[in-house]
């Protein structure tokens, strides 16, 4: 029974390591990806050896698979909590909301505003690049000022220059 519990625990460690390694690799954080890759393989080999050692029990194999599924869930929760990287958010409104813009800027968000031609009238587009860990906060602020706003958010692969980069360099000094 101890080995069954150990297999489950190892899967709950292995799969989040796999998730983090993949995220760091995609985000081009190679050193951490390599560290997590090494740890991932150590846990993987040890866990698999427990499943296939001695008498191969069906229960051990099922627990291994269940642990993998639970590990995916746990890894996703960890990833959301860490919120590594940046999001580029576009907000579209029917009216120019100076109060929203002022509030966002006071909260440290860099906002660029464009006027676009909609079907029936002009539309206002606000572009914001921010850290992923502030995405929920940004959405809540926009919802408070513009409940009918259309919002799109996605992760940029790379960027260069701009307000955010200058501010990050200033904080490092």
From Swiss-Prot:
Pull one GO CC term from this UniProt entry. plasma membrane
Q: What is the lineage of its organism?
A: Bacteria, Bacillati, Bacillota, Bacilli, Bacillales
**InterPro entries (UniProt xref):** DUF2179, DUF5698, UPF0316
Protein name per the record = UPF0316 protein Bsph_0745
Give the source species.
Answer: Lysinibacillus sphaericus (strain C3-41)
Q: What's in the keyword line of the UniProt record? A: Cell membrane, Membrane, Transmembrane, Transmembrane helix
- Pfam families attached here? DUF2179 (PF10035), DUF5698 (PF18955)
Topological type in the membrane: Multi-pass membrane protein
Q: Please state where this protein is localized.
A: Cell membrane
Q: Per the similarity annotation, which family is this?
A: Belongs to the UPF0316 family.
Determine if Transmembrane helix is one of this entry's keywords.
Answer: yes
Where is this protein primarily located?
membrane
Where exactly are the transmembrane stretches of this chain? Answer: 4-24, 31-51, 58-78
Membrane among the record's keywords?
yes
């Amino acid at each position: 029974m101890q080995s069954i519990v150990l297999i489950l625990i190892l899967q709950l460690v292995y799969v989040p390591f796999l998730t983090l390694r993949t995220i760091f690799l995609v985000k081009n954080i190679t050193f951490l990806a390599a560290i997590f890759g090494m740890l991932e393989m150590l846990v993987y080999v040890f866990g698999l050896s427990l499943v296939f050692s001695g008498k191969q029990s069906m229960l051990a194999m099922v627990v291994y698979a269940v642990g993998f599924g639970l590990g995916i869930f746990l890894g996703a929760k960890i990833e959301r909590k860490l919120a590594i990287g940046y999001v580029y958010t576009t907000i579209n409104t029917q009216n120019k909301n100076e109060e929203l813009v002022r509030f966002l800027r006071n909260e440290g968000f860099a906002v660029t505003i464009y006027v676009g031609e909609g079907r029936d009238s002009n539309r206002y587009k606000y572009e914001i690049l921010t850290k992923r860990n502030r995405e929920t906060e940004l959405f809540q602020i926009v919802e408070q000022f513009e409940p009918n706003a259309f919002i799109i958010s996605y992760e940029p692969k790379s960027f260069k220059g701009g307000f955010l980069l200058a501010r990050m360099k200033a904080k490092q000094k």
